[in-house]
Amino acid sequence: MSDHGRMHIPESGLATPAAAHSDDPPHPHFNRRVTSFRARRSTISDAQQATWDRLWPELGRQVRDGDAPAGRLDTTPAGRLDTEAWFGRHAPVVLEIGCGTGTSTLAMAQAEPDIDVVAVEVYRRGLAQLLSAMDREGVTNIRLIRGDGVDVLTHMFGPDSLTGVRVFFPDPWPKARHHKRRLLQPDTVALIADRLRPGGILHAATDHMGYAGHIAEVGDAEPRLRRIDPDDAGLPISTARPVTKYQRKALAGTEVAELLWEKTTP
């Protein structure tokens, strides 16, 4: 474990009316499959709702939901996200799957103003907190998608389109009977590898060592990815996460595994 509480897993041959707005996750209409997120209810404040109403039409998208306007999202290959039009510039794009309340998302975007970040989260409350922080801090290089990360990868991005994919502290689903719900499975990692451009980075972090071993095994088994060290120089995106509540746990003695791969082949 490093001075920052990071643990490197050795390469293996193994493993979202005012205060009562609902936060039910969107229905996964695209893929009738086991999902990695849990059902959850929460609310957003009046102030957050006001910010949402003002900014979401410009800065947010929804994969699909029973309440989504018809035609809001064209999911044909020709209708994938036009990130240059959305951000208003040509820049490398990083996709963060499961941004939570956006603490890392905001800080890393502020540190890399030349990188465009698309943050995906199922739960509206987390996106509302991030949207309010973006507004307060004047951060312009983040866009938000509410929905399932696998649906986003499948329908909204094409091959070789991403400079980075970040998956920080995904639900470990620790019980053996729930392991099938884990986000980072072979099929998902293969999809990520397809969407990364050559030289692009997959960066995963977890404080659950059982899941870390699983992620290591799955990532190392993907032939288009090569394990790299988080401190390697010359990477196209930063791998320095801010000190979040998860990092504070690490400094208190809970190890955090940082796992990175580079896409080496098309």
Curated annotation (Swiss-Prot):
Pathway(s) where this gene product acts: tRNA modification; N(7)-methylguanine-tRNA biosynthesis
Residues where substrate binds: 175, 207
GO molecular function, one term: tRNA (guanine(46)-N7)-methyltransferase activity
Keywords from the UniProt entry: Methyltransferase, S-adenosyl-L-methionine, Transferase, tRNA processing
Matches recorded under InterPro entries: SAM-dependent_MTases_sf (IPR029063), tRNA_(Gua-N-7)_MeTrfase_Trmb (IPR003358), tRNA_methyltr_TrmB_bact (IPR055361)
List of residues binding S-adenosyl-L-methionine: 96, 121, 148, 171
A GO CC annotation given for this chain: tRNA methyltransferase complex
EC assignment: 2.1.1.33
CDD domains to which the protein is assigned, alphabetical: AdoMet_MTases
Annotated active site: 171
Catalytic activity: guanosine(46) in tRNA + S-adenosyl-L-methionine = N(7)-methylguanosine(46) in tRNA + S-adenosyl-L-homocysteine
Keyword Cytoplasm: no
Transmembrane segments: none
Main EC class the enzyme belongs to: transferase
Listed PROSITE patterns: SAM_MT_TRMB (PS51625)
Family statement: Belongs to the class I-like SAM-binding methyltransferase superfamily. TrmB family.
NCBIfam families reported in the protein's UniProt record: tRNA (guanosine(46)-N7)-methyltransferase TrmB
Known function: Catalyzes the formation of N(7)-methylguanine at position 46 (m7G46) in tRNA.
Listed name of the protein: tRNA (guanine-N(7)-)-methyltransferase
Organism: Mycolicibacterium vanbaalenii (strain DSM 7251 / JCM 13017 / BCRC 16820 / KCTC 9966 / NRRL B-24157 / PYR-1)
Gene: trmB
